[in-house]
Amino acid sequence: MLIAQRPTLTEDVVDEYRSRFVIEPLEPGFGYTLGNSLRRTLLSSIPGAAVTSLRIDGVLHEFTSVPGVKEDVTEIVLNVKNLVVSSEHDEPVVMYLRKQGPGAVTAADIAPPAGVEVHNPDLHIATLNAKGKLELELTVERGRGYVSAAQNKTGEQEIGRIPVDSIYSPVLKVTYKVEATRVEQRTDFDRLVVDVETKHAISPRDAVASAGKTLTELFGLARELNVEAEGIDMGPSPTDAALAADLALEIEALDLTVRSYNCLKREGIHSVGELVSRSEADLLDIRNFGQKSIDEVKAKLVGMGLHLKDSPPGFDPSAVVNDFEDDDTSFAEDEQL
């Protein structure tokens, strides 16, 4: 059976709605395979919400104008297409906008129902004069990809309802590149860098996670043909392997003082893994193992990125006074009593 080193995925956050994801090391050629699949899935298959149609009070079709409104209906429709919304509803929902002039009409004037959110409230929709008045009824639906206005038009659509091109995808832009990376003596492994920029309706992390779930479901269909078929198995990640190695270390490697070391050995704690499975309360129950010994152990563990059971990470070893040797002699005397 072929075993490949398990790749790692890291995220470099550029801003709230843009991140770079690095996956490495990948077997030669897999960078383009995975990068192209991720890009296409991110751009076309992430579910989202969009306006599918609108109705303007007093307007029968889009090739007209509204009294007191600077923009004609076609311009208003184009502006509405740029709305960024999210919806928790599987069924179509309706939002309303009612504004009396004079002044600008923005997405902040929309009153969305519960479960629907408008993410770009500063979006300009129209401009009203002193006598202007605008009333909109916006239908929001969930979907994927792009759906044209013609496709959103239903056969029994009411007079005055204007279908809108719907861009459901919450992902704005995806680019990727494949670089060479080194694994031991080989330099032909792939390093995949995927740059993802999203609308305000979703974070890049959630978008990539959604794309990964979709691809896993699809590729799972091929595996169902023969679940025992041989492939390339992924070995443990470098992080898991390093952690396992640290946990397997004997406590001698911690270079503890004589008091702390002897107390732990007497209690039957021989490895770092056995040590981190104990809480502070467990260790304090050990004879002659006091708070000073607890602080020493915590200081040693934090240097390895570990901590005792039920203890929060982040212990500051610099706060511990390095005087652990003071009681070693008295402890030795206690041992002989």
From Swiss-Prot:
Residue ranges, annotated region (Disordered): 315-337
Enzyme Commission designation: 2.7.7.6
Catalytic activity: RNA(n) + a ribonucleoside 5'-triphosphate = RNA(n+1) + diphosphate
CDD domains with a match to the protein in the record: RNAP_alpha_NTD (cd06928)
Keywords in alphabetical order: DNA-directed RNA polymerase, Nucleotidyltransferase, Transcription, Transferase
SMART domains for the chain: RPOLD (SM00662)
Region (Alpha N-terminal domain (alpha-NTD)): 1-226
Origin superkingdom: Bacteria
Pfam families: RNA_pol_A_bac (PF01000), RNA_pol_A_CTD (PF03118), RNA_pol_L (PF01193)
Cellular component per GO, a single term: cytoplasm
Signal keyword on record: no
Aminoacyl-tRNA synthetase found in the keyword field: no
Gene Ontology MF: a single term: DNA binding
Matches recorded under Gene3D superfamilies: 5' to 3' exonuclease, C-terminal subdomain, DNA-directed RNA polymerase, insert domain, RNA polymerase, RBP11-like subunit
A GO biological process held by the record: DNA-templated transcription
Biased composition (Acidic residues): 323-337
Alpha C-terminal domain (alpha-CTD), as annotated region: 243-337
Subunit structure: Homodimer. The RNAP catalytic core consists of 2 alpha, 1 beta, 1 beta' and 1 omega subunit. When a sigma factor is associated with the core the holoenzyme is formed, which can initiate transcription.
Domain notes: The N-terminal domain is essential for RNAP assembly and basal transcription, whereas the C-terminal domain is involved in interaction with transcriptional regulators and with upstream promoter elements.
Family under the similarity heading: Belongs to the RNA polymerase alpha chain family.
Function recorded in the entry: DNA-dependent RNA polymerase catalyzes the transcription of DNA into RNA using the four ribonucleoside triphosphates as substrates.
Name of this chain's protein: DNA-directed RNA polymerase subunit alpha
Native organism taxonomy: Bacteria, Bacillati, Actinomycetota, Actinomycetes, Kineosporiales
Gene that encodes it: rpoA
